[in-house]
Structures are given as C-alpha cells and as structure tokens.
C-alpha cells in the first residue's frame, strides 16, 4: 500500500490512494458499520447476523460473482454490467461509498446485485467525493477486461449505456 500511496501522492491523485492498514478489531468494526449503514440506505448487502469480539457472521450470499457473469461476453453480461453502474450510482446518491467496488465484490442474485467486502476505509485517506470517484475507477477498471471480450457490436453500446445511467 505504501507504493500506491506514494504514486498517488506524487501524481496528486488522492482517489488512487489505498486505505492505510488497521488492526483486525478496527477492520472488523468498520466492515460491520459499513454493512449496517449501506443496508439502512437501502443498498443490497448481506445482513449482519451476529457479532462477537474477533469475528462476526453475515448472511450467506448465494449467486455468482459479477466478474464471472461478465465473462460470458454477451448481452446478458452487458445487462449485469449496467446493473453494476446503476447500483454504484444508487450507493453514491445515498451519500455512501463502497471502498472496494471491484466486479469480484458483487454477487448476482436473481436480477439484482449484492455488494460485498467493506474492510477498507478510504475515508481514512480521502474525502467522500474522492472515495466515490475511487469506486467508479475500481468498477470500470475491474470490468474492462471482460468488456474487451465483447463482440464489437455490443462493445459499441458501452458509452451509451454509461451515459444512460449517469443521465
């Protein structure tokens, strides 16, 4: 994380900073707080079922990871990608952030996505708008390889889909 921090500082790009490391107890407390805060904001996340010092239990999340769904490189994959855009926008409009908005940290369930993995705290290194910008960079970067595999006719629809979500 030190190398990424240094590169981000030299380039003046705070959203590229990694969250500084913390103790296991602080990491767990942060993840529980994020799960509860996001759920209260109406964002699909696993429910926290039980908390003890040193561990917590959350509801099992059935489904397939978004990065795996995107690997199909077809129209259905594009629909999943667009759902990810829509979810990220909903998170940000609710005044929230994810912290690790990588495609691997979303689970497709039925026709919705569930977000996972909240132990990082980017607000320890940047402002909320910067953390939200970091979410967009993580999501778009982590889905880029799968999107490159799309047939050209589908790939050409990407800018319009992104504009439609952000409009």
Where are each of the predicted segments found?
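C-lobe/activation-segment region of protein kinase-like
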Residues: 114, 118-167
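ATP-binding glycine-rich loop module of kinase domains
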Residues: 1-26
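Conserved hydrophobic "DFG−1" position in protein kinase catalytic cores
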Residues: 50, 60, 107-108
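Histidine/lysine/aspartate-rich catalytic loop segments that bind and position anionic ligands
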Residues: 53, 109, 123-127
